[in-house]
Amino acid sequence: MKPDAHQVKQFLLNLQDTICQQLSAVDGAEFVEDSWQREAGGGGRSRVLRNGGVFEQAGVNFSHVHGEAMPASATAHRPELAGRSFEAMGISLVVHPHNPYVPTSHANVRFFIAEKPGAEPVWWFGGGFDLTPFYGFEEDAIHWHRTARDLCQPFGEDVYPRYKKWCDEYFYLKHRNEQRGIGGLFFDDLNTPDFDHCFAFMQAVGKGYTNAYLPIVERRKAMAYGERERNFQLYRRGRYVEFNLVWDRGTLFGLQTGGRTESILMSMPPLVRWEYDYHPEDGSPEAALSEFIKVRDWV
């Protein structure tokens, strides 16, 4: 079947609705919607939940942008895109909980298509989800990765190991020599064997995110914590900011191509702290995190 951008867009809009409803049901607070238009073509729906019962901030952003020609930054690496009109659409979300025992989570699913008369369209899917704990719980990590593995299973035995490895490699802070979290799935440039197969996989990832995340939230949201845990959470959130502003391709692409800054930076934690030359106390739960987030096979 030939690529159907309209079908993908409808799925993404419905997915945004579903995820927001599921997060609101856990939190008790509602999302505020901000619809926006892009002068050069397209627009989106940004939804933010702030200072809820469970989530300090949760942002679920849908965007659909299109144009007559690709920006030079994109065609430099892919000369076959030159002279084509394009559509890019996706959902990107980040959840920052109040409780330091509840991990931060991120998910993204996206579709890109570039066309010109008389030529086959160039298209692909990308996406994934990853988890950033502040305090490590093995059962949470196993559940997260088991959910990821199980949703990949119908698409082939090699899919989960391949996309887990890609996730571990992508969410890595080179300047700190450490992982951002415990990973999950990451895929890009997916266009084989055909549109239907790739679209089905993207849908499985999009729907799988809340199955992976919400049971962990429910398990940890009522755990007692104090100033020490909160301070460590704010310190570790600094790594999230560093990754997004220094290494994340999506953030950089959005800012360099005149994307909507408020939506792009919606992933930022609302509060964060840095501390010069900080080292957690030996043997403390905080010190255990650096070992916990090292790459390993969780399932």
Swiss-Prot record:
Pathway(s) it belongs to: Porphyrin-containing compound metabolism; protoporphyrin-IX biosynthesis; protoporphyrinogen-IX from coproporphyrinogen-III (O2 route): step 1/1
Residues at which substrate binds: S92, N108, V109, R110, G258, G259, R260
Record's keyword terms, sorted: Cytoplasm, Heme biosynthesis, Manganese, Metal-binding, Oxidoreductase, Porphyrin biosynthesis
Chain positions of site Important for dimerization: H175
Residue stretches in coiled coil: none
Catalyzed chemical reaction(s): coproporphyrinogen III + O2 + 2 H(+) = protoporphyrinogen IX + 2 CO2 + 2 H2O
Cellular-component GO terms for this entry: cytoplasm
EC number in record: 1.3.3.3
Pfam families, A to Z: Coprogen_oxidas
Region entry Important for dimerization, spans: 240-275
Residues at which Mn(2+) binds: H96, H106, H145, H175
Entry-linked PROSITE patterns: COPROGEN_OXIDASE (PS01021)
Active site residues according to the UniProt entry: H106
Enzyme class: oxidoreductase
Cited NCBIfam families: PRK05330.1
Family of the protein in this entry: Belongs to the aerobic coproporphyrinogen-III oxidase family.
Name of protein: Oxygen-dependent coproporphyrinogen-III oxidase
Taxonomic path: Bacteria, Pseudomonadati, Pseudomonadota, Gammaproteobacteria, Enterobacterales
Name of the gene: hemF
